């Protein structure tokens, strides 16, 4: 399989013909931690499973093709992937970071900077090129963006920010979790590195914890591979298999997620209980604000079909309360100043019949008085 195929075909065929000896269509799960050698210097290409595993390699090769990268890397979580990227740098290096970045990313960057003299995060509105450029100093080494951002759904111009990064000799890192390569390919727009919480849309079934890095450039890929092997937070063979299996339907799922999200965003804008709806008109994620903070818990207790849970991107619809879940580690005054208010709810719109989702929301809204 080569990049001449469309993304739909690459996804549908993920893992097929990966075992020429047996012809297995489903990727085999290789649980072995060690691999025999025929003699000194006669490796099969696999030595120790932390370094390389046949099942994980299928996933890594596939995501590299999907994102048009030179190499892919699979980790035990999205946060493990970000930790590996942080290890490419050292204090007093700085990253410019989206101001409403995912709370887990904020927590890791904040802790590492304050306690381990790690990379310093500098938070700006990355939707503004002027703000990004104004924040660049002699210590700036990378720009890290989410687009759309989590949870305010702010979009960034990846191509223009990538030009700015190259102008200042900075690495451009894009978290593409929300859009996936089905809807966006940041490496094609000039980014150097793409990361994913593969737990979300790529695996897609709320049953595997996955982090992914896809990079361009031999030297950069070699550095990431060295840290991946040394740190060892690699994805297990079984989770690799689950992810390959799940991603086969990614194109179909993203279309349904997006169609449902567009309909739900329009529906929410018509409801008197809603103050605002944040939706970039692409993807399956949106956020909305209720008009009264006191309604939040009643609403979350009233939904029946939709699950109040702290994740996204699965087949089921989830609503998350950032104030006490994803962004709880950000001090309240700082969190609210960034726009992550106590009335804000994040909605991962699932694959259910959209009329059933609307009905569940409507019955929950009737409880708000």
Role assignments for model-derived ranges:
Residues 111, 134, 138-141, 253, ...:
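PLP-dependent enzyme catalytic core of the Aspartate aminotransferase-like
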Residues 47, 261-262, 278-287:
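Conserved glycine-rich beta-strand-loop-beta hairpin in the small C-terminal domain of fold type I
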Residues 1-46:
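N-terminal glycine-rich, Lys/His-bearing helix-loop that initiates the first secondary-structure elements
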Residues 34-88, 104-112:
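Conserved N-terminal alpha-helix of the aminotransferase class I/II PLP-enzyme fold
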Residues 29, 38-58, 65, 319-343:
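Glycine-rich phosphate/pyrophosphate-binding loop
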Residues 280-345, 349:
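Conserved C-terminal alpha-helix-loop-beta "cap" of PLP-dependent enzymes
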Residues 231-232, 303-311, 364-369:
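A common structural junction motif
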Residues 2, 13, 73-270, 278:
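Conserved PLP-enzyme active-site core in the AAT-like
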